[in-house]
A protein has these predicted regions:
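Short N-terminal secondary-structure initiator segments
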Residues: 1-2, 24-28, 81-94, 214
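Active-site gating loops and adjacent loop-to-helix segments of metal-dependent hydrolytic enzymes
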Residues: 32-67, 142-145, 192-210
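Active-site loop-helix segments enriched in His/Asp/Glu that coordinate
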Residues: 39, 58-141, 151-169
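Generic hydrophobic alpha-helical membrane-span motif
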Residues: 32, 88, 187-189
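Hydrophobic faces of well-ordered beta-strands that scaffold small-molecule active sites
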Residues: 21-27, 86-88, 115-122, 144-148, ...
Length: 217
């Protein structure tokens, strides 16, 4: 009988588990497993800004139990692959309100002995519009990191820099990190990484701010 040869994926996984396991620092577990064959064509023909709102259907129709089931499925998948720490954004906005984050905390309690879970609020509706700001403020007290998407407020109101101020103020006042989506459109006109660096210094948040995506650098 021929000796079994492990796949490269299995080899890498097993070696990393020996050294303490993976860290998944960026996920959207509340929306995991929601893609369908019918949606693929729609998403394929939509730009990123449109996708920010296309997910409203899932958010609007998902109950706490629905979110909880997706969190549990995501967490168990991470554990099965040797992930020992899992950071995920969680939608908290006027569409889904606090249903997703309530489910997230419920799941964290169940798996607290199996994996480290950290949450950041996802602000697809921005932080400038009053109702969006209300849910941002509520969500900021329910997460481990302040998440942000300044370009949403730049597109809608021309207030991307003001949105950064709100994000950094929220993080600083709570003594937690800030995790910001910037420069996602691969355009030389985008300067969000530089702007976020300037705002980080202005707010005295050096070493406590993460910029993610950054493909326009």
């Amino acid at each position: 009988m021929r000796n079994h040869v492990r796949s490269f994926k299995t080899f890498i996984r097993d070696e990393i588990i020996k050294k303490g396991g993976w860290v998944n620092a960026h996920a959207h577990a509340d929306r995991a497993f929601t893609m369908t064959p019918e949606k693929i064509g729609i998403y394929h023909n939509s730009n990123l800004q449109q996708k920010w709102d296309l997910v409203d259907e899932v958010k609007r129709t998902s109950s706490v139990d629905d979110y909880y089931a997706r969190f549990c499925q995501s967490i168990e998948l991470m554990i099965s692959q040797g992930v020992t720490a899992f950071g995920t954004f969680v939608d908290i906005d006027p569409i889904c309100e606090d249903r997703a984050i309530i489910a997230a905390h419920k799941a964290r309690e169940v798996y607290k002995h199996d994996i480290i879970l950290k949450f950041a609020n996802q602000t697809l509706k921005g932080v400038i519009e009053p109702e969006a700001r209300k849910w941002f403020d509520i969500g900021s007290d329910m997460v481990d990191m302040i998440g942000g998407l300044p370009y949403r407020d730049e597109l809608d109101y021309g207030l991307g820099l003001e949105a950064m101020d709100i994000l950094l103020d929220a993080a600083k006042s709570r003594g937690i990190m800030c995790h910001v989506h910037v420069d996602q459109f691969n355009s030389p006109k985008e300067k969000e990484t530089e702007q976020l660096c300037d705002k980080t210094i202005e707010h005295g948040m050096e070493g406590r701010v993460v910029a993610i995506h950054g493909i326009s650098i």
